[in-house]
Amino acid sequence: MYDWLNALPKAELHLHLEGSLEPELLFALAERNKIALPWNDVETLRKAYAFNNLQEFLDLYYRGADALRTEQDFYDLTWAYLLRCKEQNVIHTEPFFDPQTHTDRGIPFEVVLAGITGALKDGKSKLGVDSGLILSFLRHLSQEEAEKTLDQALPFRDAFVAVGLDSSEMGHPPSKFQRVFDRARSEGFLTVAHAGEEGPPEYIWEALDLLKIQRIDHGVRAIEDERLMQRIIDEQIPLTVCPLSNTKLCVFDDMAQHNILDMLERGVKVTVNSDDPAYFGGYVTENFHALYTHLGMTEDQAKRLAQNSLDARLVKP
């Protein structure tokens, strides 16, 4: 079944480039940039990839991202991910990147962007993988800081298809960022946002009504609010769900409890994605395979999930 799932044409709509930084590449970048890491070797680092919640993961995620310093580093990171896309028949990807993670460390915005977009262009020409880049604001920082990031992005607006919102969800509702999302939309950007992962269904309502998003990233807690579920079904608002991430971060205790197939059968436009695959133990095919192994996903369900991902693209073919 793995090979069949791997061959299925699909899109990935919820992937953080910084979260695809595999330990081997992290160590190579640290050596290249003469950065001391708190882990002795790749295996020690892999053992550190045990999280009880989103914040524990984010602490490690930001520590790893510190090894990314140069345009070549960002190119290598993005290219390594695109090679995985090619291996797994991901024909289209819409990855996130977090400029604030890097500009706050003194890395110029244009250095980060040049490395990523250079790889995405090569991914199209050399691998046949289409893409659309999403600039994501960090919600644990202020709206004013997000606005500064938007200002930095405007000279390069053609490089992006949308702006998004990620990082620590609890205590940072979408309403905190209404003004910057209004500005982004007025500048022609589409909008997406993480909501309803650890946060309550109210955060999803806010993302829809205040940020006016085209797509909900995660959204698994929508099932707790029947009125919200009906709206998502009626309006066919896509959810970019990340099963392995949800179990690694204890949103669900184990994969057998995941609600993605329940939502699919109710008519929700759910999609399968890997989120931060280097940290969560698998890319898109591994996420599909986990649904087959633990939830008994059928071939028909897999085809519908894959088609949903292609239908939910912001960048239309």
UniProtKB/Swiss-Prot annotation:
The active site is at 197 (proton donor). It catalyses: adenine + H2O + H(+) = hypoxanthine + NH4(+). GO terms for biological process: adenine catabolic process; hypoxanthine salvage; nucleotide metabolic process. One of its GO terms (cellular component) is cytosol. Keywords: Hydrolase, Metal-binding, Nucleotide metabolism, Zinc. Pfam families: A_deaminase. Belongs to the metallo-dependent hydrolases superfamily. Adenosine and AMP deaminases family. Adenine deaminase type 2 subfamily. It comes from the Bacteria. It is an enzyme of class 3 (hydrolase). The keyword Hydrolase applies. The record marks 218 as: Important for catalytic activity. The keyword Manganese does not apply. Zn(2+) binds at residues 14, 16, 194, 275. This is Adenine deaminase.
